[in-house]
Amino acid sequence: GLRQDEMEQLMAARGAGYETPESLMRRAGLSRPVLERLAAADAFGSMGLSRRSALWKVRGEAAGRTLPLFAAAGLAGQGSEAGVTLPLIPRSEEVIQDYQTARLSLKDHPMHFLREVHARRGIIPTREAAQSRNGRRVRTSGLVLVRQQPGTASGVVFITIEDETGIANLVVWPRVKERFRPVIMRARILHVRGRVQTADNVTHIVA
């Protein structure tokens, strides 16, 4: 992300907007590392640049600015490479990079790319699991949104997971938590087998 002062610089100099990463670097006075972070976060889409193309352009322009002797001789363009068309980044990789930089993605959900494999293994979407009949045993998987271990819950852990279809609420008993503690407490994606428990119109999957 950006520091507060970096964001203020960017906003103060934007005027009618920025046309290229170079104009952003020049007008806002942002450093190359800051522009690289913006490129990695796919922030240059409005300029018609993909994440990979933006990184390439930022690094190339920054390198060009470090040759004052050539610039003074009017030779700044000498030795520069011809335009390169970069291959598109696979959509799954784009989504992963979105999560690494912004903790979310508007392109797709990471679990979408596992759906075909999960279907073959009998792992159902969270929405289907949450709507299953009371007492049914299910297998589902999702990205961890929330972990809670209230002091009054006698060691029980409550976890909310999410996939591209919705969310499911998990109840993890102490014996299960102790058996799988590193996974339960730290994993970003959880696969769970449990029994559906519905009471007062609230559904949990009890692991």
Name each model-derived stretch.
Residues 140, 166-170, 203:
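Short beta-strand segments
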Residues 4-6, 137, 165, 189:
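Coil-to-beta-strand transition motifs
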Residues 176-192:
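Short nucleic-acid-contacting surface segments enriched for D/E, G, S/T with interspersed K/R
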